[in-house]
Structure formats: structure tokens, C-alpha cells
């Protein structure tokens, strides 16, 4: 009975660990960061900012005063630092959840449990999904805002499938242990 509760707790914990962080901002633009420019491209046009604050909007170069140029420099610098921070934070949360669940599995079921490989596979799949939102490239990174909803849905499906497999593995492993004890 204790092991069944463990399996249920694992499922609930994994679902909770995967719970979506809700952001108050709804992105409507792709952001492409390269060493030469930061490009914000979407429904309202195409904005390109250089590290020194030069601005081009929909192909037209704009002359800025000193204050506007500083704002442009600050904006592109903020995007350059924030997007990698968001990417790392999201991947770190998934990794921490995997480590916590793996520790419980090892403690309760042993290091040879098949649940561990399912958990590792899920971790890799979720990180791969996240790479579709913030894609790291050799020359920078790209934030794909249109990928968010699709990745959320596919990620939830991956979690559901993995949890079903983990639950089945836990039942099989608990049954095998019970037979060996008899």
C-alpha cells in the first residue's frame, strides 16, 4: 500500500513540477539576438537595434536623439541578457524536478528502477521542446513566440505519457518485489 501511495505521489509531484509558470506578458513578437543586432519581428513590424543604439523600423533607418539612443541601447542590452536568463531558468526548473523525482525513485524503488530511464527521457524531451521556444544558434538565439502554445500542449502530452509509463513501471516493480518476498 505504501508503494502505491508513492506511485500516486510521484505522479502528482511530477505534474506539479511541470505546472506552467504564468507570465503576465503575452509575447507577440519573435526576438532574434545576434552579435550585430537585436531584431524584434512580429505583428507590428520589424525593429532592428544595433548595440550602439541605431534603430531601423520596417527597413527605414531612424535618427534618434541622445535619450532615445540610450533607450534603444538599454532595450537591446536587456533582451540580450534576459532571454538567456529565461532559457536557463526554465531548463533549471525541469532539471531540479527531475533530480527530486529521481531521488525519490532511487530511495523507494532502487537504482535499477526502469522509472529512472523514463524520467531521464522525459527531461530530455521537455528540454528539447523548450529549445523550440528559445533556440540557441551559433550566432546568438531566437525567441519564437508562436511556438509557446504548441510546446505547452506537446509538453503536457509528453508528461502525461511519461507518467502513465512510470505508473505502470511502479506497479510492475512493486509486484515483482512482492513476489520475491513471498
Question: What would you call each of these model-derived segments?
Answer:
Residues 1-19:
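Gram-negative bacterial Sec-dependent N-terminal signal peptides
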Residues 18-182:
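Terminal leader/tail segments of proteins
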Amino acid at each position: 500500500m505504501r508503494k502505491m501511495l508513492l506511485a500516486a505521489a510521484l505522479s502528482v509531484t511530477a505534474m506539479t513540477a511541470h505546472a506552467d509558470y504564468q507570465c503576465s506578458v503575452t509575447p507577440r513578437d519573435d526576438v532574434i539576438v545576434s552579435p550585430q543586432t537585436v531584431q524584434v519581428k512580429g505583428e507590428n513590424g520589424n525593429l532592428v537595434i544595433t548595440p550602439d543604439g541605431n534603430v531601423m523600423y520596417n527597413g527605414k533607418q531612424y535618427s534618434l536623439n541622445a535619450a532615445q539612443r540610450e533607450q534603444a541601447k538599454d532595450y537591446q542590452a536587456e533582451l540580450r541578457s534576459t532571454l538567456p536568463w529565461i532559457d536557463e531558468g526554465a531548463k533549471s526548473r525541469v532539471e531540479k524536478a527531475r533530480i527530486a523525482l529521481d531521488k525519490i525513485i532511487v530511495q523507494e524503488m532502487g537504482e535499477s528502477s526502469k522509472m529512472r530511464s523514463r524520467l531521464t527521457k522525459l527531461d530530455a524531451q521537455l528540454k528539447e521542446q523548450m529549445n523550440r521556444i528559445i533556440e540557441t544558434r551559433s550566432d546568438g538565439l531566437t525567441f519564437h513566440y508562436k511556438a509557446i502554445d504548441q510546446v505547452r500542449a506537446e509538453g503536457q502530452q509528453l508528461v502525461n505519457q511519461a507518467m502513465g509509463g512510470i505508473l505502470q513501471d511502479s506497479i510492475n516493480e512493486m509486484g515483482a518485489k512482492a513476489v520475491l518476498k513471498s
